[in-house]
């Protein structure tokens, strides 16, 4: 009787029917603190708690925005295709969806890698174009042109923040040394 139960447990074990995947991704900061505007607001309103920030990379066609949108699209696909598993951000994928899911995720990762390389190659031009756009917007509003290079992350910072880490993990089973059950539980 006990061998039949063991065989049934082997067949119905979640480790035979699903896989765990973990995804983490980085992005770039797209807002900068505007200390000049903060000083004016604090002086006029008398509120020392005010923080004013300005949007970076306002142009929706900017490669940085495209990268962020693609990373968000990948994350949304990952969440919709998998189920939550535990508190460590792992997600469970049914084995029947494995090939479709992994192919789509690999496509996303390849696209993001190409975009990342383009961003890093053209970083100084992307920053300068955005500075010009922000300063033109400020000038059109009659405000001083305060956008500057120091508002943006450096190339080295960008290299560290634009990443995708995606990998499968085994699902723990009764035989896994990291997972133990009391002998009484094994008999149930």
What is the role of each PLM region?
Residues 1-119:
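An N-terminal, globular interaction/scaffold subdomain
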Residues 89, 93-187:
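Long amphipathic alpha-helical segments with strong coiled-coil/leucine-zipper propensity
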